[in-house]
Amino acid sequence: MADNTDNRRSLWGVPEKLQLHIAMLTLQFGYAGFHVVSRAALNMGISKLVFPVYRNIIALLLLLPFAYFLEKKERPAITLNFLIQFFFLALIGITANQGFYLLGLDNTSPTFASSMQNSVPAITFLMAALLRIEKVRINRRDGISKILGTALCVAGASVITLYKGPTIYTPASHLHAHLLTTNSAVLAPLGNAAPKNWTLGCIYLIGHCLSWSGWLVFQAPVLKSYPARLSVTSYTCFFGIIQFLIIAAFCERDSQAWVFHSGWELFTILYAGIVASGIAFAVQIWCIDRGGPVFVAVYQPVQTLVVAIMASIALGEEFYLGGIIGAVLIIAGLYFVLYGKSEERKFAALEKAAIQSSAEHGIERAPVSRNSIKSSITTPLLHQSTDNV
């Protein structure tokens, strides 16, 4: 039966499982390119306030038609309360999130910005636990795994921030120098990935991850009362643009900052808006719907590896011992958290099956575990389907 279903979902003879893996690998390359392109944009002098404004305008233009036509029936009437919630989501999920990311990226490097993002699932879990949105069962392996994973992520972020360490790889001496000589017209405008203030950059990236995690946590109750994901994202983008414009009005006084001075600058903004916010959004929502949230999250470290290769070639990025150690700890922590979430779903599925069985036979049975947990936190766009995991 499963094989027949898989065959029906095949495209040009390619089974859906393989489609999902190809899509996720492609998605990581798209996101990895965004890290490198964003750093290149900063190297070229694009304003940290102008860049996100243009990026979110493009994203909003891409999202609006889909939100309007696909969610006509399920979109509730807009109220002042909803507008306030969307404004708050934009403040943490767009303005703080993207602002801290660009500040952190400007002071560190694409690879370690990507490495820090691997800690978001653990920070989200910790934040939800502290707010009592999610319960922690320390007497079960899923609870222990999530606590251990969170501790590893915190340790990794601390190592990256507090210990830079010696340089263990410098591509500029061979590969990057050769490429820069033979392709100077292409690579020269990109600049390099030399960090300015490593510790400050890492603090900014921690702020980025905290903002991202807070956005995930607080978006869950909003989606319960306003179950139109595309519309919520569109409103969030809109208010994010307004907030960045207000900040730019006070902090960005140079009118030339809003003008594109080269084709490279235009390319970086189009890439960020179309690929990172448009195409990637569509691919991710399909992969989550068909493969489940854990399947999608497992591929995140692949992005870090791809970023390292891209940044080394295009920007001549150097790698530091502290960054490598921290990245390994964070990725290990990510997988512990994902394992804990997977085990949690198994417990929930067993409990649900037991309840259904009891109802069918008219017999009252004890739950599978009196400590069974009901997950109450939902990552945006993360459907619970795990058909292909």
Curated annotation (Swiss-Prot):
User: What is the topology of this protein in the membrane according to its UniProt annotation?
Assistant: Multi-pass membrane protein
Mind telling me which InterPro entries this protein's record contains? Answer: EamA_dom, WAT1-related
UniProt-listed GO biological process terms: auxin biosynthetic process; auxin export across the plasma membrane; auxin-activated signaling pathway; cell wall organization; defense response; L-tryptophan biosynthetic process; plant-type secondary cell wall biogenesis; positive regulation of auxin metabolic process
UniProt modified residues of type Phosphoserine: S372
CC terms in the record's Gene Ontology section? plant-type vacuole; plant-type vacuole membrane; plasma membrane
Q: Please summarize what the entry says happens upon disruption of the gene.
A: In stems, defect in cell elongation resulting in dwarf and bushy plants with altered mechanical properties, as well as little to no secondary cell walls in fibers, including xylary and interfascicular fibers; these symptoms are partly reversed by continuous light conditions. At the flowering stage, red, dry and bent downwards stem apices. General repression of indole metabolism, including tryptophan, neoglucobrassicin and auxin (indole-3-acetic acid). Broad-spectrum resistance to vascular pathogens, including the bacteria Ralstonia solanacearum and Xanthomonas campestris pv.
Q: Which residues cross the membrane?
A: 18-38, 49-69, 76-96, 111-131, 143-163, 198-218, 230-250, 266-286, 294-314, 319-339
Pfam families to which the protein is assigned, alphabetical: EamA (PF00892)
Q: Report disulfide bridges, numbered on this chain.
A: none
Q: In which tissues is it expressed?
A: Mostly expressed in stems and hypocotyls, also present in seedlings, root, leaves, flowers and siliques. Ubiquitous, mostly expressed in vascular tissues and secondary wall-forming cells, including developing xylem vessels and fibers.
**EamA domain segment(s):** 32-161, 210-339
GO MF entries: transmembrane transporter activity
Q: Can you say where in the cell this protein is located?
A: Vacuole membrane
Its principal location?
membrane
The UniProt record lists the keyword Repressor? no
Q: Which UniProt keywords apply?
A: Amino-acid biosynthesis, Aromatic amino acid biosynthesis, Auxin biosynthesis, Auxin signaling pathway, Cell wall biogenesis/degradation, Membrane, Phosphoprotein, Plant defense, Repeat, Transmembrane, Transmembrane helix, Tryptophan biosynthesis, Vacuole
Keyword check for Endoplasmic reticulum: no
Q: Which family does it belong to?
A: Belongs to the drug/metabolite transporter (DMT) superfamily. Plant drug/metabolite exporter (P-DME) (TC 2.A.7.4) family.
Q: What does this protein do?
A: Required for secondary wall formation in fibers, especially in short days conditions. Promotes indole metabolism and transport (e.g. tryptophan, neoglucobrassicin and auxin (indole-3-acetic acid)). May prevent salicylic-acid (SA) accumulation.
Listed name of the protein: Protein WALLS ARE THIN 1
Q: What organism does the UniProt record list as the source?
A: Arabidopsis thaliana
Q: What gene codes for this chain? A: WAT1
